[in-house]
Amino acid sequence: KRKKMTTINIFTENIFDGWQPDEKDVIEKTKRLLEFYISELEEKSCLNNRDYSTITLDIVFCDSKKTQEYNRDYRNKDYPADIITFAIFADDENSFIFDGEINLGEIVIALDKVIEGVNRDISLSLNKEQELFFLISHGLMHLLGFDHQSEEEYNFVIAEQRKALECIEYDKI
């Protein structure tokens, strides 16, 4: 468990016209999700045995055309995604830390896909914000180095997300 305080910097950018999530709310809840993950999972994450005082990450809101472009350009997959993560720190074997600051990377979310998902899955009765924070919590797991290549890993990631979402009172997901 971490003894010293960690500063968390979250920067958001919205290039999607169809919905403007509340930036303050996004930053505050994302910080709480990340704090939960650090307190629960640091030893299993890419932060283990690292000396840091600050964690930085970016969240970009866009449309599915943009995520398709990213998928095509960086992952050789030509289809849109609801979320793409660029885990700069977890994926770099050098794990560069500058002045105690770790840049975890970037979460890119297609807000049109979020809206589409909520409208499609009426039976789940999630609102846009719940769906959005489900995706953000998932992206944070990837930025911390967790993946889900196997069913076991997938179940672990989803179980941890559910616990984290309880911290921001989105435990119905």
Which residues are covered by each model-predicted region?
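A conserved beta-strand element that flanks and buttresses the S-adenosyl-L-methionine
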Residues: 136
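An acidic/histidine-cluster motif and surrounding catalytic segment
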Residues: 1-133, 144-173
